[in-house]
């Protein structure tokens, strides 16, 4: 613990303008920096702190973060139906945003995250036996761009391609930034929260044309089987506390 505390102090001193986040009880350390300092910070972590390996890199879409689809703390005849009707972005079709109430054709919610897209790199130092996360948010939601880290850790080449393919994050300076998982001509980025769960097109083999063709989705019903919930929701904790008090009486 003393070694980790020293490491956190050194991070805070070296990157004075950054945010150091420690998640308890596991003690996971995340250094959050502005996108403009993303590349320089990564280089310093490799050369000055001994993080010689980048284990992973991924994109994150924080659209709708902190919002759920479950309206009740207790089991009811209406709670689940409200959940499965789909209140979150992208549950039904492209570009549809729900209201605070039920329905998928309402207005865009008023409370949107100030920064939507983030990139997170997981770093490892073998010489110091340390692991940490480096995170930055893309400043422009419409066109998320951050610097490529392939010049520092070449092994991130395909990880950045994956984040580009699934989230649409552009890595400036990447030597070969093209899709890696989706098909040729794929429209959109499927891990974005506003991408429809049923997709935009479906694939089938056309017997007459003797080839695979794409058609608009028709065979999948847009239904949410598992509503989105928040772990340790305050409403749930309050309900449990009230039940515990009633049991004591």
From Swiss-Prot:
Q: Which keywords accompany this UniProt record?
A: Cell membrane, Membrane, NAD, Quinone, Translocase, Transport, Ubiquinone
Where does this chain mainly localize? membrane
Extract the GO molecular function terms from the UniProt entry. NADH dehydrogenase (ubiquinone) activity; NADH:ubiquinone reductase (non-electrogenic) activity; quinone binding
The record's catalysed reaction(s) read:
a quinone + NADH + 5 H(+)(in) = a quinol + NAD(+) + 4 H(+)(out)
Gene3D superfamilies according to UniProt: NADH:ubiquinone oxidoreductase, 30kDa subunit
The compartments listed are: Cell membrane
Concerning Pfam families, the annotation shows: Complex1_30kDa
Gene Ontology cellular component list = plasma membrane
Q: Looking at the keywords, is Zinc present?
A: no
Q: What is its EC number?
A: 7.1.1.-
Its biological purpose is as follows: NDH-1 shuttles electrons from NADH, via FMN and iron-sulfur (Fe-S) centers, to quinones in the respiratory chain. The immediate electron acceptor for the enzyme in this species is believed to be ubiquinone. Couples the redox reaction to proton translocation (for every two electrons transferred, four hydrogen ions are translocated across the cytoplasmic membrane), and thus conserves the redox energy in a proton gradient.
Family to which the UniProt record says this protein belongs: Belongs to the complex I 30 kDa subunit family.
Tell me how this protein assembles.
Answer: NDH-1 is composed of 14 different subunits. Subunits NuoB, C, D, E, F, and G constitute the peripheral sector of the complex.
Protein name in the entry:
NADH-quinone oxidoreductase subunit C
Q: Which organism is it from?
A: Stenotrophomonas maltophilia (strain K279a)
